């Protein structure tokens, strides 16, 4: 359907947005780094790629606009004329042709500058050529400002047009303004057309839908038409003329005999005869509306004669209605639908396609064996059966009556098993067997299992009362008692050791090396004595190791060396340690110079701390542009690192 295509047109951007989209896409989708030291062929290819990519993007955008807009020569004549009335066919074609011309100009500019880039001898000249090419393309697009704005307005209006199918079953409502066309449409369809007591409330085509005989129908409410030449009709009236001229439908011509619409009966009859050529080969229904105010029988002689000129036409059917009091509204709809269905069937029978179908249809009729008539036989019981009456006490009781008597829906549970047809009626209410792996579960269920379980529970309680499960074994061996006592003391000691270790760890102290915690011989002896262990052998072993170390030192040197070493040792012990001056105070003599020096040191450390330097000698240069953050480009499905 063309109207569905109208609603799918992509929004058209203005000039500035168009250029922003194109240039930003070029910047994102093409390389951005080039150096003057690269090969000239690489530089030419770099800028040539940018020019070509920009031209491709502009061409793609303009092509999508040109392809999405409907071609007036290819769509239905109704939609083509409607677009001509609403937007002017020539204006629309000129706007589209200007975009097509701009597309070709952009292609020519890109072709010329790519040829010039092949002769660029430096990065600067190639860059200037690229800049000139993109500038000329942007200038060409900027000149299409008015065309893009006009096409965007047309697109917005097209998307709001009603979805009119020119090939489906259609009822077309027409007539003078304010004769009740929109009121009738609101009655027979789900549309909500604005109805006001003044003329030209409806200024465009409105569509409503309804179902009749399981078929989908559409009703088109047209704006009011005035009786004047076609050249003098405005856009609102021309929409109605276009619909009547091109849509194959049933035309409902509404007349207001009460003249409350502001137009006389004679004017309405004259308008009918003026637009009668548009009703050729169409089903025409004359709808006399507002009969609650004026009926045809109450008209004067002159108006009745004028009305009769329309009725005398053999192709016109007359229906009376009143939308205010809902008189004859459905009759109008039924009459129009039946007439249109018959006309469509008749038209299809006149076509050539029906012969292809009729040749394959054969109606089989039984051959008469004699002259005896054998009509359909209807039993007397069926003929005498009375119609069901809910108020009849002797009526047949239905399932609905049983449900209502037992609480209604949601309360009463319908018993469906009483309708089962089985060999034995007693089987109706048997429970359905539960099958598992092709076997009936009921066959494997012990009916006495609950009684057996109860007997087992009673026996268990009896054994517990008698002390059957109580243990008679007691520990009477003294050795076993001693072992158990030692084991309990060991477990208690391990627990205390673990707690002490935990308390030691939670103290906020630095962890010292193993050598810093060396204990003396006296501490070792005291700990062994407290544990009840001998310590004499430990002391003797320590003294022997000390004597062995001293003898080794004497064996390494001569006696003179030993005497010298002993003299040096005595002399070193007699010399007092040399006093050391505070290095922070050296070189600072004046009062207040210390605080100034500290303040100056802090100032000098600011830069080092900000640059995350370890010290003054830290000269490490970190990466100015981390490659894992700045390398790669996401585009065309290619990804490097990121």
Swiss-Prot record:
Residues 582-601 have a biased composition (Basic and acidic residues). GTP binds at residues 175-182, 221-225, 289-292. It comes from the Eukaryota. GO terms for molecular function: GTP binding; GTPase activity; RNA binding. It is found in: Nucleus, Nucleolus. The keyword Repeat does not apply. GO terms for cellular component: mitotic spindle; nucleolus; preribosome. One of its GO terms (biological process) is ribosomal subunit export from nucleus. Residues 602-611, 625-642 have a biased composition (Basic residues). Residues 169-341 form the OBG-type G domain. The modification Phosphoserine is found at residue 471. The modification Phosphotyrosine is found at residue 468. CDD domains: NOG (cd01897). Belongs to the TRAFAC class OBG-HflX-like GTPase superfamily. OBG GTPase family. NOG subfamily. This is Probable nucleolar GTP-binding protein 1. The lineage of its organism: Eukaryota, Fungi, Dikarya, Ascomycota, Taphrinomycotina.
């Amino acid at each position: 359907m063309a109207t569905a295509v109208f609603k799918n047109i992509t929004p058209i951007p203005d000039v500035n947005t168009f250029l922003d989209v194109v240039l930003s896409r070029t910047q994102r989708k093409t390389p951005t780094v080039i150096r003057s030291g690269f090969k000239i062929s690489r530089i030419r290819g770099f800028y040539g790629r940018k020019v070509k990519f920009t031209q491709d993007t502009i061409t793609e955008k303009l092509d999508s606009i040109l392809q999405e807009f409907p071609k007036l020569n290819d769509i239905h004549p109704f939609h083509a004329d409607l677009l001509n009335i609403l937007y002017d066919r020539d204006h629309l074609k000129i706007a589209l042709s200007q975009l097509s011309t701009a597309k070709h100009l952009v292609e020519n500019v890109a072709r010329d500058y790519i040829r010039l880039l092949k002769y660029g001898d430096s990065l600067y000249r190639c860059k200037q050529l690229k800049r000139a090419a993109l500038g000329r393309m942007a200038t060409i697009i900027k000149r299409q400002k008015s065309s893009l704005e006009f096409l965007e307005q047309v697109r917005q209006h097209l998307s709001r047009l009603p979805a009119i199918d020119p090939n489906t079953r259609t009822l077309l409502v027409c007539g003078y303004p304010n004769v009740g066309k929109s009121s009738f449409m609101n009655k027979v369809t789900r549309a909500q057309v604005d109805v006001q007591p003044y003329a030209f409330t409806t200024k465009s085509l409105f569509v409503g839908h309804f179902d009749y005989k399981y078929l989908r129908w559409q009703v088109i409410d047209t704006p009011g038409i005035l009786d004047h030449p076609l050249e003098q009709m405005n856009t609102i009236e021309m929409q109605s003329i276009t619909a009547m001229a091109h849509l194959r439908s049933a035309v409902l011509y509404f007349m207001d005999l009460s003249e409350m619409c502001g137009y006389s009966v004679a004017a309405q009859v004259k308008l009918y005869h003026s637009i009668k050529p548009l009703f050729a080969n169409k089903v025409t229904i004359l709808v006399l509306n507002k009969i609650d105010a004026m009926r045809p029988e109450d008209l004067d002689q002159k108006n009745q004669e004028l009305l009769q000129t329309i009725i005398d036409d053999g192709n016109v059917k007359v229906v009376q209605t009143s939308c205010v009091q809902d008189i004859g509204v459905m009759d109008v709809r039924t009459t129009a639908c039946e007439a249109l269905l018959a006309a469509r069937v008749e038209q299809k029978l006149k076509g050539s396609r029906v012969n292809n179908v009729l040749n394959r249809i054969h109606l089989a009729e039984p051959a008469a064996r004699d002259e005896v008539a054998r009509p359909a036989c209807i039993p007397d019981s069926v003929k005498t059966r009375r119609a069901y009456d809910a108020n009849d006490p002797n009526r047949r009781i239905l399932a609905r009556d049983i449900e209502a008597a037992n609480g209604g829906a949601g309360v009463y549970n319908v018993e469906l098993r009483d309708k089962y047809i089985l060999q034995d009626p007693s089987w109706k209410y048997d429970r359905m067997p539960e099958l598992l792996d092709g076997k009936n579960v009921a066959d494997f269920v012990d009916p006495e299992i609950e009684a057996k379980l109860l007997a087992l529970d009673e026996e268990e309680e009896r054994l517990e009362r008698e002390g059957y499960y109580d243990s008679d074994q007691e520990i009477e061996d003294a050795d076993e008692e001693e072992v158990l006592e030692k084991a309990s003391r060991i477990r208690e000691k391990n627990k205390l050791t673990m707690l002490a270790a935990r308390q030691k760890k939670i103290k906020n102290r630095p962890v010292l090396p193993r050598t810093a915690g060396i204990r003396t011989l006296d501490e070792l002896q005291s700990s062994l004595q407290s544990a009840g262990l001998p310590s004499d052998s430990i002391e003797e072993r320590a003294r022997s190791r000390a004597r062995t170390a001293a003898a080794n030192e004497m064996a390494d040197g001569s006696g003179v060396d030993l005497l010298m070493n002993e003299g040096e040792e005595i002399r070193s012990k007699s010399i007092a340690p040399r006093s050391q001056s505070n290095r922070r105070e050296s070189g600072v003599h004046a009062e207040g110079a210390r605080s100034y020096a500290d303040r100056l040191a802090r100032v000098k450390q600011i830069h080092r701390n900000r640059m995350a330097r370890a010290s003054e000698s830290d000269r490490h240069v970190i990466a100015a542009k981390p490659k894992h953050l700045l390398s790669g480009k996401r585009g065309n499905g290619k990804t490097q690192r990121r």
